[in-house]
């Protein structure tokens, strides 16, 4: 065949490909997923995902081939939020106030942050070593209350909500000057040492169980009291930009998340063994299992009591943009659940 004939054949083939919509390979999704978590039993589903390589498994099932999944441990919402918005991670985790704050800041932009699902509903307790403190009204300027991040963490917001109830809405920040930022493991160490300035810790499982097991440490308040019932403690979130660019990868992460949560609920003992091995905690598997079987603890993707926190944050001016429903704060994959 002449050169001209070959050229005509190539042009004809190209036109055929264009007409079939296959002129170029489909947009390739990311080959790496970067996720971050914090410390404690509330992040168990993510630890299960990491340990069993569930995201990698689901990605293969969805035809994405081999992908790399990186996991980071961050100590509070400040670092988590910065990492997500700077593009350093694809999936972030933390408390409900952090999700609401991120959503309010990014709503309507390509970087809009929304929840992928709740990690759990768990009691989050304020514990103290000060024998004179029977309620938050008894704290003085000699007390220091450890929270993961002052003003913005779940515990910091819960303390504000409690203060608003106790001292009046205009005094919601009355206890803020007493708070200090510490990751939960460090806060527990400081509280139990008895030699420092930390006299209270707005804690989380398993740390709060360890703390009240020591003489002189007791619980004076919980998130369930403040919010009027079971409430989501931690959430997984991502950006619309990542989800839109990587729909199959996002779906693989969700499937892995659902699988991990189902596995925990099916065999809590095995899940407790994973937590002990991965965290290096001193608790026995039996002690961890007892915490996980607390009837107030639930591993579920269903968001609960989200709007109560959002309404408070809007009322006191912490956020400028208020969601009209909990569904505004989450991607559609959980919209079919009975959230609140």
What are these regions (language model features)?
Residues 1-6:
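N-terminal secretory signal peptides that target proteins for export/translocation
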Residues 22-28:
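Sec/Tat signal peptide C-region and signal peptidase I cleavage site
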Residues 8-21:
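Bacterial N-terminal signal peptides
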Residues 74-78, 93, 149-157, 185, ...:
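Soluble non-cytosolic domains of exported or imported proteins
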Residues 244-320:
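Secondary-structure end/capping motifs
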């Amino acid at each position: 065949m002449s050169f001209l004939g070959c050229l005509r054949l190539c042009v004809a083939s190209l036109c055929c490909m264009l007409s079939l919509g296959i002129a170029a390979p489909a947009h390739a999704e990311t080959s790496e997923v970067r996720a971050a978590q914090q410390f404690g039993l509330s992040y168990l589903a993510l630890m299960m995902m990491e340990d069993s390589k569930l995201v990698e498994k689901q990605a293969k099932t969805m035809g994405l081939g081999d992908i790399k999944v990186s996991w980071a441990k961050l100590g509070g919402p400040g670092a988590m939020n910065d990492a997500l918005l700077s593009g350093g991670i694809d999936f972030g985790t933390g408390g409900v106030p952090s999700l609401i704050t991120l959503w309010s800041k990014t709503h309507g932009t390509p970087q809009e942050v929304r929840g992928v699902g709740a990690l759990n509903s768990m009691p989050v307790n304020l514990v103290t070593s000060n024998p004179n403190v029977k309620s938050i009204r008894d704290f003085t300027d000699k007390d220091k209350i450890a929270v993961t991040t002052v003003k913005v963490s779940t515990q910091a917001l819960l303390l504000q909500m409690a203060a608003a109830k106790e001292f009046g809405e205009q005094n919601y920040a009355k206890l803020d000057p007493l708070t200090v930022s510490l990751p939960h493991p460090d806060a527990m160490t400081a509280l139990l040492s008895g030699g420092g300035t930390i006299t209270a810790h707005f804690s989380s499982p398993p740390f709060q169980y360890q703390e009240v097991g020591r003489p002189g440490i007791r619980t004076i308040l919980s998130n369930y009291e403040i919010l009027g019932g079971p409430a989501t403690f931690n959430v997984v979130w991502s950006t619309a930009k990542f989800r839109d660019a990587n729909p199959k990868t996002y779906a693989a992460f969700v499937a892995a998340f659902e699988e991990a949560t189902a596995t925990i609920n099916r065999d809590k003992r095995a899940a407790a063994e994973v937590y002990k091995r991965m965290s290096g905690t001193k608790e026995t598997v039996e002690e961890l299992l007892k915490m996980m079987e607390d009837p107030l603890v639930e591993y579920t993707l269903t968001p609960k009591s989200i709007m109560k926190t959002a309404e408070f944050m809007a009322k006191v001016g912490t956020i400028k943009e208020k969601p009209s429903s909990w569904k505004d704060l989450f991607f559609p994959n959980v919209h079919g659940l009975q959230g609140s």
